[in-house]
Amino acid sequence: MDYDKLSKDILQLVGGEENVQRVIHCMTRLRFNLHDNAKADRSQLEQLPGVMGTNISGEQFQIIIGNDVPKVYQAIVRHSNLSDEKSAGSSSQKKNVLSAVFDVISGVFTPILPAIAGAGMIKGLVALAVTFGWMAEKSQVHVILTAVGDGAFYFLPLLLAMSAARKFGSNPYVAAAIAAAILHPDLTALLGAGKPISFIGLPVTAATYSSTVIPILLSIWIASYVEKWIDRFTHASLKLIVVPTFTLLIVVPLTLITVGPLGAILGEYLSSGVNYLFDHAGLVAMILLAGTFSLIIMTGMHYAFVPIMINNIAQNGHDYLLPAMFLANMGQAGASFAVFLRSRNKKFKSLALTTSITALMGITEPAMYGVNMRLKKPFAAALIGGAAGGAFYGMTGVASYIVGGNAGLPSIPVFIGPTFIYAMIGLVIAFAAGTAAAYLLGFEDVPSDGSQQPAVHEGSREIIHSPIKGEVKALSEVKDGVFSAGVMGKGFAIEPEEGEVVSPVRGSVTTIFKTKHAIGITSDQGAEILIHIGLDTVKLEGQWFTAHIKEGDKVAPGDPLVSFDLEQIKAAGYDVITPVIVTNTDQYSFSPVKEIGKVQPKEALLALS
């Protein structure tokens, strides 16, 4: 893949660098905050090689890339003045409260996920080593590795402070100093001593801030306003000293007196609410969550669960949300594996197997967008697989006990605890159910490549022949959303090699546009066919086109319809790819006779039945 070219194309199609406030990436997606989402050309973005799809979550514009997203992101940064350091604070775009919340969660937690994932995996591996007797508990090695695993979680407020400051547009190092203050060992000891505490006569509520999420987020949000307010009234020559000094003096005590305790209470209630739901309706809750989590991933809103997961483990020592994400991923992997088993297209079989393995590793977008959603029924099967695993988890009370990386096999140590065996069984159930459901539901296979054409079905009502010499392509490759999205109907496209268009069927000419760039034919069997020569060629107003027919003429396969000057039109900057559409698509089922490769006029391409 040419990452440099792809990055330049993406920047152009999102409205140019000037339309980008900020760009970050997660494991599979580029996440843009754009000044105006309407300027992004979604249809053309989705046609780019390497782009699996686009999505808008809240106000965030997302481009789904897959495993190569870090390389594409690096290329974007290399070819622009953008980075994840750019503040979104300058946006003039109005956001509703829900959109703003999801945008903040994504922007704050995405940058720190590698640290949390790495530390969580180390915690899991240490627990595994102790369980199997490979490491003595309290040994020097154990103490050091435990510190490595615990460090990111104990000092989580510090990581969040820096990330949140970048998101809120304040100084990340002052934010880190705020977090460091509330985590100071002497202050922690004072807060944990159980004695009344006050600051200049104001009571300080005892609370523990290590490993917490909400208190520091509220604190840095307030700090961003305090810092800007002080900056506004401070002379430029004094800002370096005055702004950070007074920000710390105001925000740290405010955090200890009001913000911190409020955040701690909110976190406790949030955790208690999740636990109550799973304690009293665990079976139903887990079935619904595991069965629909893939839909949540599609919206990109799954990152909204990250702070809840972290908070649950910090408050209670376990979490029920991450297991649901695991099951959804296993369902996607199983459905894609079923496609591998059933498909007769060698290339697509290979893709299905590869994406199934990737989903098992915790990266589901390639399987979801590249295989299961493309074939539709396997995606429904994946949801069934997740729900089946959710039923088992709900009955057995499976939980995760640490925060790990992706919800895939490498992160299995997150389950080390009382329900570990049940967790493994549930993963197998989700994968097997996804596989079985997809296999039994079946799907319309991607036609096999190759020079040998499949036989036309005996029950076919109509055969559509090629109207032009050239190379046949899928409609999805047409750089016009109306055609590529199938809005006009199903069909195929041809990249012409000569400027002669002939009739693809026996029937009557129903329409010939005055610009002669488009012809409508109704076959004797009732198929309504549109041949559209090039894209935007209506602007030529008939120049370089010659019609050989008129409306009402009877035609047979191979009869001349229109001649056009291929080279002149290309030289004028027009794309000459020619969609051939069956506009009354809903009346037929389609069987491609030849889907790719060179074609001659009158060569059978599509069977309608």
From Swiss-Prot:
Listed transmembrane segments: 112-132, 141-161, 174-194, 202-222, 246-266, 281-301, 321-341, 351-371, 379-399, 412-432
Localization (cell): Cell membrane
Active-site residues, Swiss-Prot/TrEMBL: 26 (phosphocysteine intermediate), 532 (tele-phosphohistidine intermediate)
Record CDD domains: PTS_IIA_glc (cd00210), PTS_IIB_glc (cd00212)
Swiss-Prot/TrEMBL keywords: Cell membrane, Kinase, Membrane, Phosphotransferase system, Sugar transport, Transferase, Transmembrane, Transmembrane helix, Transport
CC annotations in GO: plasma membrane
EC number: 2.7.1.-
Main location: membrane
Biological-process GO terms, alphabetical: phosphoenolpyruvate-dependent sugar phosphotransferase system; trehalose transport
Residues covered by the PTS EIIC type-1 domain: 103-459
Task performed by this protein: The phosphoenolpyruvate-dependent sugar phosphotransferase system (sugar PTS), a major carbohydrate active -transport system, catalyzes the phosphorylation of incoming sugar substrates concomitantly with their translocation across the cell membrane. This system is involved in beta-glucoside transport.
Domain note: The EIIB domain is phosphorylated by phospho-EIIA on a cysteinyl or histidyl residue, depending on the transported sugar. Then, it transfers the phosphoryl group to the sugar substrate concomitantly with the sugar uptake processed by the EIIC domain.
Membrane topology qualifier: Multi-pass membrane protein
The protein's name: PTS system beta-glucoside-specific EIIBCA component
MF terms (GO), sorted A to Z: kinase activity; protein-N(PI)-phosphohistidine-sugar phosphotransferase activity; protein-phosphocysteine-trehalose phosphotransferase system transporter activity
UniProt xrefs under InterPro entries: Dup_hybrid_motif, Glu_permease_IIB, PTrfase_EIIB_Cys, PTS_EIIA_1_perm, PTS_EIIC, PTS_EIIC_1, PTS_IIABC_b_glu, PTS_IIB_1
Entry annotated with the keyword Cell membrane: yes
Principal EC category: transferase
Species the sequence originates in: Bacillus subtilis (strain 168)
Residue ranges annotated for the PTS EIIB type-1 domain, each copy included: 1-86
Domain PTS EIIA type-1 positions: 480-584
Family annotation (Pfam families): PTS_EIIA_1, PTS_EIIB, PTS_EIIC
